[in-house]
């Protein structure tokens, strides 16, 4: 764009120089025509017309020159503005390049952080998947163990119920046997007590008889026999007492 403006300016300057040269030639011709006006009256009108045309052309050229100067001034101002704009553009471009560099660095840093974060998350996900698989295996094994334990507990419960029933039946039978034995021993005890009372009565009678017949040998033997029976009954009575106490 600047090269085009320079070319236009050079073209205008060249045209201006040419016009100026034409203007000087025209003035010279006018002077020549004026000096020869007395001689060449026949050509005066033509020269006047030419002069008029030249004046008009001169005015036109002046206007053109003025416009060219204005354009040149505008172009100079435009060049100055363009230079300022170029400087501003360069500054903005430099700032943009700096910002782009910072932005690229920031993006690269964010990308690296993102990559690192993604890798960490992927590692955590893999670890969690492995842990989940392990937990699933443990849960399956525990469920199998729980099922097996439930079956074992049910079997043991049934077995325990059966054993309890058997033990209860056994103990009921043993208790009934013990009750029967106790009743029998109680009956024996009562019988022995009755016998003991009878023997005590006999002993009392025997003692009375012995007192009357102290010298009677037969009575002595009877007393001795009664004593032995009494001792035997006492021993049996003690044995029954111990049995009853232990029962």
Swiss-Prot record:
Q: Name one GO biological process term.
A: intracellular transport
**What keyword terms does UniProt attach to this protein?**
Cell junction, Coiled coil, Endoplasmic reticulum, Host-virus interaction, Transport
- Tissue and organ expression note: Expressed in leaves (at protein level).
A GO CC annotation given for this chain: endoplasmic reticulum
Chief site of localization? endoplasmic reticulum
Cystine pairings recorded for this chain: none
Coiled coil as UniProt keyword: yes
Please verify whether the record's keywords include S-adenosyl-L-methionine. Answer: no
Localization, UniProt: Endoplasmic reticulum; Cell junction, Plasmodesma
Report the function annotation for this chain. Involved in intra- and inter-cellular trafficking through plasmodesmata (PD).
Quaternary data: Interacts with viral tomato spotted wilt virus (TSWV) movement protein NSM, which is involved in cell-to cell spread of viral genome and enlargement of the host plasmodesmata size exclusion limit (SEL).
| Name of the protein in its database record | Protein At-4/1
């Amino acid at each position: 764009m600047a090269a085009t403006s320079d070319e236009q300016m050079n073209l205008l300057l060249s045209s201006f120089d040419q016009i100026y040269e034409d203007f000087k030639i025209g003035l010279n011709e006018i002077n020549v025509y004026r000096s020869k006006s007395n001689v060449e009256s026949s050509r005066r009108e033509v020269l006047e017309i030419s002069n008029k045309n030249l004046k008009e052309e001169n005015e036109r050229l002046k206007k053109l020159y003025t416009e060219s100067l204005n354009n040149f001034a505008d172009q100079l101002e435009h060049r100055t503005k363009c230079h300022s704009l170029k400087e501003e553009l360069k500054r903005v471009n430099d700032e943009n390049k700096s910002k782009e560099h910072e932005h690229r660095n920031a993006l690269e840093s964010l990308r690296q952080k993102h990559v690192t974060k993604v890798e960490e998350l992927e590692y955590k996900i893999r670890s969690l998947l492995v842990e989940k698989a392990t937990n699933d295996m443990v849960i399956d094994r525990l469920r199998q163990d729980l099922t097996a334990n439930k079956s074992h507990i049910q079997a043991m419960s049934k077995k325990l119920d059966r054993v309890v029933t058997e033990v209860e039946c056994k103990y009921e039978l043993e208790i009934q046997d013990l009750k029967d034995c106790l009743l029998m021993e109680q009956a024996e005890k009562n019988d022995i007590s009755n016998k003991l009372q009878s023997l005590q009565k006999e002993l009392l009678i025997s003692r009375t008889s012995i007192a009357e017949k102290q010298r009677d040998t037969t009575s002595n033997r009877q007393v001795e026999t009664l004593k032995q029976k009494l001792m035997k009954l006492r021993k049996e009575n003690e044995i029954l007492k111990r049995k009853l106490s232990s029962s």
